[in-house]
Amino acid sequence: IGIKAKIHLKLDTGMSRLGYVVLDDKVEEIAAEIKEISELEGIILEGMYTHFATADARNKEFENLQTHRFSEMVEKIKDMGVEIDYIHCSNSAEILDCDEKYDMVRPGIIQYGVYPSNEVNYSIDIKPVMAFKAKVSNVKILDAGTSISYGRVYFTTVREKIVSIAAGYADGFLRGRRNPYVYINGVKCSIVGRICMDQSMVRVPMDMDVKVNDDVLVFGDDLVSVDDVARDCDSIAHEVMCMMSRRVPRVYYRHGEIVSIVDYL
């Protein structure tokens, strides 16, 4: 149809996931093949990139090897007269830790104000921009010996005030946490019984003034960070944030005021 596709060619320098596998003893051969690709009539080779396997680790030995492989290929291809506008390799961790940024960067989790790991450079001050909140859906007083939720794995030992919250595993409130808790009215409160698909039950102090529609903080500020949640379920912040489903409305703020609410359902 007379339209050329602009492409970015990926080099696999050690991630072993996707891309054109770069072998140390075949640099010339690989570069020649990429030159042939750049000359195909239907495409424009606009960019070339790689991805690091250990960018968020303190030990940079393997990352340095990947960087060497990538830069060697870039130089070899340029020497063959192939002009590429955008060379890029920096994810969030690489942006924080390394000086070589090439023509573009690919920030991911740092756009949400979260560090990729506890082994990266913390000298850049970033602030979390995302919180996961729910609402209280029910408040009840239960007598001692009452079972709660599926499987009856939790029984009240005394009279307890139990709050149901409108958040469950279908929303991204992970069932795999070892010691799940939330904050209600600034008070840390434990989840009791198994987390359900749409609801979860929370034990609150008997004297707490709590009512339906009160806010519940799952994660998102100094009280409980996404990293706290990730550690509690042997995961990483990336996974915890990605698990928040489309069932949860997105509320956008600017200068403390709601500017948009997006509900995908």
Regions found by a protein language model. Give the residues of each.
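Active-site loop/helix belt of alpha/beta enzymes
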Residues: 3-6, 13-135, 142-143, 261
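Internal, well-ordered alpha-helical scaffold/interface segments
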Residues: 134-137, 163
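C-terminal accessory subdomain/extension
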Residues: 141-265
